[in-house]
Amino acid sequence: MAEMGSKGVTAGKIASNVQKKLTRAQEKVLQKLGKADETKDEQFEQCVQNFNKQLTEGTRLQKDLRTYLASVKAMHEASKKLSECLQEVYEPEWPGRDEANKIAENNDLLWMDYHQKLVDQALLTMDTYLGQFPDIKSRIAKRGRKLVDYDSARHHYESLQTAKKKDEAKIAKPVSLLEKAAPQWCQGKLQAHLVAQTNLLRNQAEEELIKAQKVFEEMNVDLQEELPSLWNSRVGFYVNTFQSIAGLEENFHKEMSKLNQNLNDVLVSLEKQHGSNTFTVKAQPSDSAPEKGNKSPSPPPDGSPAATPEIRVNHEPEPASGASPGATIPKSPSQLRKGPPVPPPPKHTPSKEMKQEQILSLFDDAFVPEISVTTPSQFEAPGPFSEQASLLDLDFEPLPPVASPVKAPTPSGQSIPWDLWEPTESQAGVLPSGEPSSAEGSFAVAWPSQTAEPGPAQPAEASEVVGGTQEPGETAASEATSSSLPAVVVETFSATVNGAVEGSTTTGRLDLPPGFMFKVQAQHDYTATDTDELQLKAGDVVLVIPFQNPEEQDEGWLMGVKESDWNQHKELEKCRGVFPENFTERVQ
């Protein structure tokens, strides 16, 4: 029996719910069709819109916060792995290993604490805040259904009120019929029954209307109070949430900054203690390493071998080649020392070919007066001197050679015009005391006490010696050696090879570095590739000095000091260096 009762209650409840759904659906259809009016509350509808907006924003904030926490978790894992990697590569003998391990542990704890506080103070608060929205949302939906029930009950009650007159007319018609067919006493009972039935339906409709109105108003009043309050609470919730996140993040970064600073101090200390292991590799000549001697200057572009310059004693002009040697681009020695960048080729300048007549013209009558003739007081002629005797018949003492090394021909190979020759200063001590110095540019020749002007044959014989075209039959010219007049000519030309004057006075060498050999001028820029090399610019003058250890000298390289550095510092050890010879041109 109990089972039958429970089944009946369940069936009745289902039937009631179905009846309610049908009634609500019918009412909504009538409202949409305009046949039934709908109760509206604009203020409540605005609150519902704000509620939906607030729910959307809160849901999005919760989603983004969960993403942020997931990123913090991932960052924690990445930082943990990085710290583990540091612990693995940090060798036990290195200083500060314990401090580094402790910093790694504190780093891990700091990340865990930061993540947990974010969960407690931000995520859980967000979940609590959003937990009230589903209940309110369901109450709003229920309030909408109760509003439909209220409208349906109201419409039903109003329909009964308007149909009262129609029912009375329907009841009056049967009464008239009954009056005709039934006795008088029976007609009154029938009319009373119809009136009672109509009143019962009206009373039921009124009760349902009052009940629906009461339920609706209760829910409506509650929601009217809660929705505005919930909407206003969003500001404080957002402020507290983001303040908590910002404060936690600030404290986290402060603590993390301290840990990072401590780790940086440990690493700096490690770097300082192991700084001696870092050194700069500098190439030094040794027995095991290949020397610079293996390096040789690059051959010229025309393929001709680079030969050592030789001194031309006969002073013949060098034959002009097809292409001007000035266009040759010098190359630095290769192998161990990297060569400098290829300099731009210089402009071609036409070389002036010296004719033999121009050379011979230096020894005719116009050239003889420049020779100052001195007569030593203790000199006695070996025999009578005739007026017709030539210079070749004289036996005069040869001049000592200049102490400075003879300048080799310039790499450019261009002939220097004779009009650019400059007189040579003789060394101190060459001439006897009391004799005039040759600083004025005249050639000092020791003549006998009885002198005579040279005859016309003198220039011809001298020119034969200068030109180097000695005939086999001329015995007088063949006997002329370096002890006769050609010694003067050789001395003159050796002092002015390629137009460069060799200053060899003692006073001129006071400002030169010890062991000075000659001067060169850079023709192209050279960038030093090692610490022992000179940095050259086109036009720099370099004072060439010998190597301290001749075995260290490499082929194609010279040791020297820039003239500007020497004049400024006067410190040979700091200013000297090596440089490629084929990037320079000898000037003195």
Swiss-Prot record:
Q: Where is the composition biased (Low complexity)?
A: 474-483
**At which residues is Phosphothreonine found?**
308
Q: Name one GO cellular component term.
A: Z disc
Q: Which UniProt keywords apply?
A: Acetylation, Cell membrane, Coiled coil, Cytoplasm, Developmental protein, Differentiation, Endocytosis, Endosome, Membrane, Nucleus, Phosphoprotein, SH3 domain
- Highest rank taxon of the organism: Eukaryota
Q: Which residues form a coiled coil?
A: 15-42, 193-274
Give the Gene3D superfamilies listed for this entry: Arfaptin homology (AH) domain/BAR domain (1.20.1270.60), SH3 Domains (2.30.30.40)
**Which BP terms in the Gene Ontology apply to this protein?**
endosome to lysosome transport; lipid tube assembly; muscle cell differentiation; negative regulation of amyloid-beta formation; negative regulation of calcium ion transmembrane transport via high voltage-gated calcium channel; negative regulation of potassium ion transmembrane transport; negative regulation of transcription by RNA polymerase II; negative regulation of ventricular cardiac muscle cell action potential
* Residues with the N-acetylalanine modification: 2
Please give the tissue specificity annotation from the record for this chain.
Highly expressed in the brain and muscle. Isoform AMPH2-1 is expressed only in the brain where it is concentrated in axon initial segments and nodes of Ranvier. Isoform AMPH2-2 is widely expressed.
User: Which subcellular locations apply to this protein?
Assistant: Nucleus; Cytoplasm; Endosome; Cell membrane, Sarcolemma, T-tubule
Domain (BAR) ranges: 29-276
Is S-adenosyl-L-methionine one of the keywords UniProt gives this record?
no
Q: Give positions of region: Disordered.
A: 279-355, 448-483
Q: What does this protein do?
A: Is a key player in the control of plasma membrane curvature, and membrane shaping and remodeling. Required in muscle cells for the formation of T-tubules, tubular invaginations of the plasma membrane that function in depolarization-contraction coupling. Required in muscle cells for the formation of T-tubules, tubular invaginations of the plasma membrane that function in depolarization-contraction coupling. Is a negative regulator of endocytosis. Is also involved in the regulation of intracellular vesicles sorting, modulation of BACE1 trafficking and the control of amyloid-beta production.
Q: What is this protein called?
A: Myc box-dependent-interacting protein 1
Question: What is the gene called?
Answer: Bin1
